[in-house]
Structures are given as structure tokens and as C-alpha cells.
From Swiss-Prot:
The lineage of its organism: Bacteria, Bacillati, Bacillota, Bacilli, Bacillales. This is 5-oxoprolinase subunit A. It comes from Halalkalibacterium halodurans (strain ATCC BAA-125 / DSM 18197 / FERM 7344 / JCM 9153 / C-125). Belongs to the LamB/PxpA family. Pfam families: LamB_YcsF. The keyword RNA-binding does not apply.
Amino acid sequence: MQRVDLNSDLGESFGAYTIGQDDRVLEHVTSANIACGYHAGDHNVMARTVKLAADKGMGIGAHPGFPDLLGFGRRNIQTDHKDIYNFIVYQVAALNGFCQLHRVRMQHVKPHGALYNMAAKDRVIAEAIAEAIYDIDPSLILFGLSGSELIKAGKKLGLTVANEVFADRTYQPDGTLTPRSEANALIKESERATEQVIQMVKESKVIAVDGSHIPIEADTICVHGDSPTALSFIERLHAQLQVEGVTVTKVSDFLFK
């Protein structure tokens, strides 16, 4: 039977500000990417979100980003290999501390926002991220855009990698995501988003914005939980995957070295 993971970016509240609906999203996904304080989140939110995810048996992952609270980690920042390596270590280790407190093992690491997108194309950035993860714990699973430089960098080091696809994002002919600055970046119709996911999972391809068919691997599907219709969409997607004979489960249940 075919298996796939559903992941969502969580723990993005900080201080007096509440972002997202983490408690409810955790009812429907199998892996949680938890912000580590640089682009969103803080120490209290990290502690709470790890506990919530641990109590529900989720696969728990660190979601490190650029040090950019004002831009929510979505602004490209030019820096060097060592800086990227160090801020990945800093954030991943911080979240791992909360995992240790709750006696759960961290499952994965997924970079956030601009860092994720830059690592998809830039080999130097991708290698800095992969090296940091490997040096912290080589058993961690690296989430990256399917077929990207980040996936290649992880494989090169011997990390277990999870090819990630997106339910609500459109794709460029080169397999990258359409930038959020473009009008057609997001898929807002739940039926269309569901169809795209089923095609990626069952047929290993996706239709790009120019109509071309791109081969794609789908180990984990990113669903966003911060819109008014997010929960109903995630429920529908989960149900449709089951109808198609796909088991939804965390990646550590089926990806091994």
C-alpha cells in the first residue's frame, strides 16, 4: 500500500501574538514543522507546541528560518556558508532541547520560507543546511522541495530525505514553486488543490503553470493551516487520499536509510 505524510508549519505564534490554529490542525496532519524563534515562535510557544505534537504522536520537526521576524522569514538574505550552518545548528538544537524534555525523538528538519526556496536552487546554501543537520544528528530526516538541490545535498551526505510537495502552490516548469509575489502562486480552490495532490502522489507528476507535465516524487505533502478554509481542506484531502488507497502516516514510519 502506498504511504504519504501530511505536514504543516506550526508554532508560529510569539509573545502576545497568535498565528494559526495549531491545536486543530494537529488533529489532521502526521508531521509538525515547529518554528524555532528566528522567523516566528518563541521559547514558550516551542515548548507548548512540542508537547501538543508529542501528545498526539506526531512526527516532530524543526522549522528553522532566516533571522527575520519582521519579514516572517520570507525575505532573501545573502549570507555565507558558515552563518547558515551556525543558525541552523542554533535553531535545531533549541527545538531538540524541548523534544528531550518531553522524551520524544525529533523526526525531521524542514527549512522555512526564503531559506527553503533558496536552498532548492543554491547548492552552497543546500549543503550548509544538510551539513548542519548531519552534524547534529545524522538520523534526522531532511525535508526539501522534491528533486531540489537540498534533496541532492542531503543524499550526498547520506541523510534520509523526504521529497516534499505542496497542495496549495503552483509549480514552475523547472519544478520550483511559483514565487508568492506572483498572482498565480497559490491554489485557492480546494478541489483543484486536492486533484493536484492526488496526481502527484498517484502519478508522480504535476502540471506546471505553462501546462507542461513535470515528474515529481511525493513523500510528504505540505498543507497550510492558517486560512479560514484550511481545516475543511485538510480533512477533505486526508479522506480523498484514503479513498485512493493511500495511507497517511508520518515519514519515519516508511522512510529508512
